[in-house]
Amino acid sequence: MPRTTPRTLTCGLLLTAALTSSGIAQTTPSRAVLPTGMGEAIDRDVARLRAATERLKVSDAAVAAGYTPETNCVQHQPHGAMGIHFNNMALRDATLDVETPEVLVYEKRPDGTLHLNGVEFLVPFTAWTKEEAPSIMGQKLKRADALGFWYLHVWNWTVNPSGLFADWNPDVKC
């Protein structure tokens, strides 16, 4: 049987910490979100976004931070689903900040718990006065005329086979 020394214990703890913080050791999905393959600037922004939303992975913490569940699970087959949107109405303005998303997007797991899959940045048309679309993380927000706002999804806590900024995730189920 191998001998446990302070050095092997330290190495094991460091490896566990590295895997956990990178998302590799999470039980959901086995593929890592980072690196994105979209360049260092996007990777830095995703890392900042993950650090800022780490505490909001538990939906009770999101509610305590001012987010309110606003939708049932949103899906659009055969493209997949988005999940359950938790909105923070106080953040709906013309300001976009990687560390302060307007919407958190959760998926209900078979055991009934909610898993934070990503976020949505949102700017109401009434708040945006410029001609060009607002942008964040090097991406222009999409226009949702029927809903009256600009938006961008970021799948920062789960891999989306359709892409980091895709609207729908085929792996998300309602």
Q: Where on the chain are the PLM-derived regions?
A:
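Bacterial N-terminal signal peptides
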Residues: 10-20
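Sec/Tat signal peptide C-region and signal peptidase I cleavage site
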Residues: 22-25
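Primary mode marks residue(s) on the alpha4-beta5-alpha5 output face of response regulator receiver
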Residues: 27-174
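Bacterial N-terminal signal peptides that target proteins for export
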Residues: 2-10
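Residue-level signal for functionally critical sites in structured catalytic/ligand-binding pockets
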Residues: 2, 18, 106-108
